Swiss-Prot record:
Residues 1-361 are annotated as: Constant region. Residues 362-444 are annotated as: Variable region. The keyword Repeat does not apply. This protein is expressed by a shufflon (= clustered inversion region that works as a biological switch). The orfs of this region share a constant N-terminus, while the C-terminus is variable. This is Shufflon protein B'. Keywords: Plasmid. It comes from the Bacteria. InterPro entries: Enolase-like_N, Shufflon_N. It comes from Escherichia coli. SUPFAM superfamilies: Enolase N-terminal domain-like. Pfam families: Shufflon_N.
Length: 444
């Protein structure tokens, strides 16, 4: 069977394929334009970041740049300068994707030379197409974005402004980027560095930093979390709950209502450690120390003993109890036996070391009291004998006896101490007759 419509089918298939190919080519063009646009937007963001860093640098160094620029001679800011001063990260490249290098040209305003204005210009590398320049000029967010199309003039986005590059001492070529930083923009940057912000600004810690002294005009600084400082001078009182100091605390005087605790020593160079109200020094660990509770005596806390390997020296030393010595009692001054003394009961020594005591107002040797003679008499047949006894409290130190008879013949046959306080003696007449004896006891 003949097929009369076969040619028309082939024609329809070819037309469909042609349409598909046209759609693919059109879509590829749109995709390529999209990729280009995204790339130019990225370039615009990089230029915005660079311009923002230059703006901050100018604000920070406003006075310095005023001194290094004129209305026709610019101060030039480079990428290296921004990286070295921390306004750009160290990884920021010196050139963009087309090999162009950004620089800022800062000059004084011709109408008001006290103010600055600047132009950011790219130079070198490969020129951008006009479409890219127009797109990037609109997407730049810092300053007034623009471009250079004739190599001499910077033109703003949507042709909103136009400035000759020579006004800024800048040079470039066709197909390059330009950003205008007006006098008002840079004045705001300078104010940013001078103004102390109440809130944190991300990426701008310098806005919360003082660069000079602040005068509160006798007003308060309230609700401070922490004060970190190198030194502090106060003409009045400093009140607080706790204080920690890693170094020294100095002052003319200090008053504390409760306790002062130190981890180390407490020293006074030329003053006293003064306490009041019957208080003094106390060792908390062992419960000892010194205090005064009257105007006469320094007392030991809890009646603790005082121990030293050195000397304890004073005008007088009094013991209400016994006085002990682990060695000897050394009396340095001497007295003379027979000399007057007061009061009775004093103990001393003479120059030979003999012990003296004050008795009845006179220095006497110990054991050498007043002598007293005790006597006893007896009469008996041929062998008379007797014993003389000392008064109470006296001791016998010697003695003897005397014998007598009618005929004169009699002998002292015995004479001896018969006890600690008596002396005995006896006689012999050798004849049958009576004899008499008198016995003497020397008592002291």
């Amino acid at each position: 069977m003949k097929k009369y419509d076969r040619g028309w089918a082939s024609l329809e298939t070819g037309a469909a394929l042609l349409i598909v190919m046209l759609l693919i080519a059109w879509g590829a063009g749109i995709w390529q334009d999209y990729i280009q646009t995204k790339g130019w937007q990225t370039e615009a963001r990089l230029v915005s970041n660079w311009t923002s860093a230059a703006r901050s640098y100018i604000g920070k160094n406003y006075t310095t740049l005023q001194g290094s620029s004129t209305t026709t001679t610019p101060a030039v800011i480079t990428t290296t300068m921004l990286k070295n001063t921390g306004f750009l990260s160290s990884g920021f490249t010196e050139t963009n994707s087309e090999g162009q290098r950004l620089q800022a040209y800062v000059v004084r305003n011709a109408q008001n030379p006290e103010l600055l204005q600047a132009m950011v210009v790219s130079s070198g590398g490969t020129p951008y197409p006009v479409k890219a320049l127009i797109q990037m000029a609109k997407d730049i967010t810092t300053g007034l974005g623009g471009y250079i199309q004739d190599g001499k003039t910077a033109t703003g986005a949507l042709r909103s402004w136009s400035v000759a590059l020579s006004n800024y001492g800048a040079k470039s070529g066709n197909g390059h980027i330009a950003v205008l930083l007006s006098t008002d923009e840079l004045s705001g940057a300078a104010e940013d560095t001078d103004r102390l912000y109440r809130f944190q600004v991300n990426g701008r810690p310098d806005l919360n930093k003082m660069h000079t002294a602040i005068d509160m005009g006798s007003n308060n600084l309230n609700n401070v979390g922490a004060v970190n400082a190198q030194t502090g001078n106060f003409s009045g009182n400093v009140n607080g709950v706790n204080g920690t100091f890693s170094g020294q605390v100095k002052g003319n005087s200090g008053n504390f209502d409760v306790n002062v605790t130190a981890g180390g020593d407490i020293r006074s160079n030329n003053g006293w450690l003064i306490t009041r109200n019957s208080k003094g020094w106390l060792n908390e660990t062992h419960g000892g120390g010194f205090y005064m509770s009257d105007g006469s005596w320094v007392r030991s806390v809890n009646n603790k003993g005082i121990y030293t390997g050195g000397q304890v020296k004073g005008g007088t030393v009094r013991a209400d109890g016994r006085l002990y010595t682990g060695e000897y009692l050394q009396l340095e001054r001497t007295a003379v036996a027979g000399a007057s003394c007061s009061p009775n009961g004093l103990v001393g020594r003479d120059n030979t070391g003999a012990i003296l005591s004050c008795q009845s107002g006179t220095w006497r040797k110990v054991g050498s009291g007043e002598l007293q003679i005790a006597t006893a008499q007896a009469t008996g047949w041929r062998f008379p004998g007797a014993t003389a006894t000392c008064p109470t409290g006296k001791r016998v130190t010697g003695g003897g006896g005397i014998c007598t008879s009618r005929t004169g013949y009699i002998w002292l046959t015995r004479s001896f101490p018969s006890a600690n306080n008596s002396w005995s003696a006896a006689c012999d007449t050798t004849e049958d007759q009576n004899g008499s004896i008198t016995v003497y006891a020397i008592c002291q």
